[in-house]
Amino acid sequence: FAKRYVELVIVA
């Protein structure tokens, strides 16, 4: 689940 969060943070 960390990978999904990391991707969201990068997009943010």
Swiss-Prot record:
Signal peptide start and end residues: none
Residue positions binding Ca(2+): 7
Cofactor: binding comment: Binds 1 zinc ion per subunit.
Keyword Chaperone: no
Post-translational modification: Contains 3 disulfide bonds.
Tissue: Expressed by the venom gland.
Highest taxon of source: Eukaryota
Domain Peptidase M12B, residue spans: 4-12
Cellular compartments per GO CC: extracellular region
Cofactor section: Zn(2+)
Cellular compartments annotated: Secreted
GO molecular function, one term: toxin activity
Keyword field: Calcium, Disulfide bond, Hemostasis impairing toxin, Hydrolase, Metal-binding, Metalloprotease, Protease, Secreted, Toxin, Zinc
Miscellaneous information on this protein: The molecular weight was determined to be 21,390 Da.
UniProt similarity note: Belongs to the venom metalloproteinase (M12B) family. P-I subfamily.
Function: Snake venom metalloproteinase that impairs hemostasis in the envenomed animal.
Quaternary structure note: Monomer.
Name of this chain's protein: Snake venom metalloproteinase
Organism of derivation: Crotalus molossus nigrescens (Black-tailed rattlesnake)
